[in-house]
Regions:
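NTP-dependent nucleotidyl-transfer catalytic core
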Residues: 1-222
Length: 222
């Protein structure tokens, strides 16, 4: 749905004469990949991934959550896998890249049917090497606090709770990658508008994200 809405917005702005950059911000990174890799190693089948990548990978994710109820140690295993992925361990990176490539083939098949194209597929993984800059910037500006080994930005006085920036094991989160993505896009495209088409369930996330960018001194954030 968000893809179709985003494409409609693109057509409107394009017709008005704007130079529009269409970005598909793939959710191709995060702890869910630790869980899917874990599930694949325990119960996976290569041919299933090749034949039906989306259905199969979602099935692995569901299977993981069913099994973790009976075997809680799987959670630790998945976290360790994602940490290895973030650190560039070859086996984890190879599996992650394969999952991404097979999924993208299927996505592109559907996009072609819908007549939708993108100028960029830079998703969450694209920003993995850019995040340390912003974690350091948050620390230098006195915005980052330590809490039980994790790092947070306290937004309580804005009525936005606490934003988790890095977990206690050092792994990053969606909001960390979104901060890096926003600044990268501004520096790369110098946009007049940066329009996100997302579900309403992400309202708090984006309110926190905008507030953090403003506190960092990025006046264009709102």
């Amino acid at each position: 749905r968000s893809t179709v809405i985003g494409n409609s917005i693109y057509k409107i702005y394009d017709a008005l004469g704007y130079n529009v950059i269409r970005i598909n911000h793939l959710g191709d990174y995060g702890t869910q990949f630790g869980k899917m890799i874990c599930a694949y190693r325990h119960w996976g089948n290569k041919e299933d991934v090749i034949n039906e990548p989306i259905k199969t990978l979602l099935g692995y994710y569901t299977k993981f959550h069913e099994e973790v109820e009976k075997h809680p140690e799987l959670d630790d295993e998945a976290r360790e896998i994602f940490t290895k992925l973030e650190h560039g361990e070859p086996e984890e990176v190879e599996l992650w890249q394969w999952f991404r490539d097979e999924s993208l083939k299927e996505f592109n098949r559907v996009y072609k049917m819908l007549g939708i194209e993108f100028d960029s597929y830079n998703g969450e993984s694209f920003y993995s090497d850019k995040m340390p800059r912003f974690v350091k910037e948050l620390e230098e500006k006195g915005l980052l606090e330590e809490s039980r080994g994790a790092h947070i930005v306290d937004l309580e006085k804005y009525g936005l709770g606490v934003a988790l920036i890095t977990k206690s094991d050092g792994s990053t989160l969606y909001i960390t990658r979104d901060i890096a993505a926003a600044v990268y896009r501004k520096e790369t495209y110098d946009f007049y508008k940066n329009i996100y088409v997302v579900a309403s369930q992400q309202n708090l996330h984006f309110q926190q994200w905008i507030q953090i960018l403003e506190l960092m001194g990025y006046e264009w954030a709102r």
